[in-house]
């Protein structure tokens, strides 16, 4: 697949500088791009690569255009432009292209137009698959689960029963949605399992990375709103709610009944306590331990930044003595006040 620069400019609302008839076949980095490639510059610290780049064209801002020695598409945000061009030139194969003979599909499953189901997939009774849904090899879709149009599951995804997924969703391999939440009562040391009777409701245009787990609700559904993106190896516990447009980076853990607002950004390996709320537009940096609600938009961090082992040992020793140091300081302050 190829587009001329003029065609790409029309798609992006960009301005062509150079030969608009040149064909672009793929995207590449500034350093590695060659003939037929388009690249981008979104950070001026990489501007020096422009002089040596062999790209056919560069996505660039008006401010950086004087430094560009080749053809260019000028637009406000080159990185967003790159993302859209990459979509147009995407050569990623589909999870499945037809219904494989080895797929096991219950008799009452409702299949939309052009549905594809890969080898050894299992689709149970009561499932509804919208138009252009793609189910990869080895997937399991449990009873009464619904997938909206154009949603895709890569190989070996598991959707338990009573899951609702909207349109244009993408789930990467190994992810499990709808397993039991961690719900138990304790009676004199004996754990009594609480059946998890809710489901999982996932909105439209949600993307979920590989090997992530999203538990079903205890009584009501776990909810993921529209336009949420979740990275690999995250744990979303029962009855968590994640608001519109929030991004969750890899290895994040969210305990039960956490409510995350709209447009939040959650850094990797963050840990959240349950039964609390995070307000809209909160940014939590990586490795944070969030034990209390966040009520004001802003950037939040916790943890000790990287040090040499020797420095870290000194810091740890001082932290262990902080209560003792506080008491000594208080005594000194009182003594000074008395004098």
UniProtKB/Swiss-Prot annotation:
It comes from Aeromonas hydrophila subsp. hydrophila (strain ATCC 7966 / DSM 30187 / BCRC 13018 / CCUG 14551 / JCM 1027 / KCTC 2358 / NCIMB 9240 / NCTC 8049). Pathway: Bacterial outer membrane biogenesis; LPS lipid A biosynthesis. One of its GO terms (cellular component) is membrane. This is UDP-3-O-acylglucosamine N-acyltransferase. PROSITE patterns: HEXAPEP_TRANSFERASES. Its EC number is 2.3.1.191. Homotrimer. It comes from the Bacteria. The gene is lpxD. HAMAP family: LpxD.
